[in-house]
């Protein structure tokens, strides 16, 4: 399957129309697949809690747009913050298993390619930092 500007535009348009201001386009056939590969179109204002994945690392590659990726310690203090932008040298990040993180979308039409181990596991209450 070709990943082109038209596909990115389609997923971004769907994100703008979604109340959560984001939309996935999955390349895996099932939520039980051992590899979860997807486009994630994100709009400014989307809310992603500080969270972690205890059993998998997670990789983001920014295809279009700009976002801030922030990392936290167990007390909720920021330990690192990076800007990922498709027009700069910082275009991706591999987030280690168990690392608290969140992101802030800085421009409209931002799209990332996201990969993590499957099967899909919704976040548990103890995977969200309060």
PLM regions with names:
Residues 55-75:
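Glycine- and acidic-residue-biased ligand/ion/polar-headgroup-sensing regions
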Residues 50, 69-71, 92-95, 101-106, ...:
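Short beta-strand His + acidic residue motifs that chelate non-heme Fe in jelly-roll/DSBH
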Residues 3, 7, 11, 77, ...:
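Double-stranded beta-helix
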Residues 52-54, 61-62, 105-108:
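Short glycine/proline-enriched turns and hinge-like loops at secondary-structure junctions
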Residues 39-55:
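Conserved short histidine dyad/triad with adjacent acidic residue
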Residues 1-35, 81-86:
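A short, N-terminal "cap"/entry segment at the start of jelly-roll beta-barrel domains
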Residues 73-98:
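Short acidic-glycine-tyrosine-enriched beta hairpin
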């Amino acid at each position: 399957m070709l990943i082109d500007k038209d596909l990115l535009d389609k997923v971004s348009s769907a994100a703008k129309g979604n109340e959560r201001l984001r939309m996935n386009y999955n390349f895996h056939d099932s939520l039980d697949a051992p590899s979860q590969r997807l486009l994630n179109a994100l709009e400014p204002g989307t809310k992603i809690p500080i969270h972690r994945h205890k059993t998998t690392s997670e990789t983001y590659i920014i295809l279009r747009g700009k976002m801030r990726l922030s990392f936290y310690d167990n007390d909720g203090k920021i330990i690192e913050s990076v800007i990922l932008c498709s027009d700069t040298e910082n275009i991706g990040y591999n987030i280690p298993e168990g690392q608290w993180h969140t992101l802030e979308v800085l421009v409209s039409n931002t799209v990332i390619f996201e990969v993590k181990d499957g099967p899909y596991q919704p976040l548990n209450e103890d995977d969200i930092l309060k």
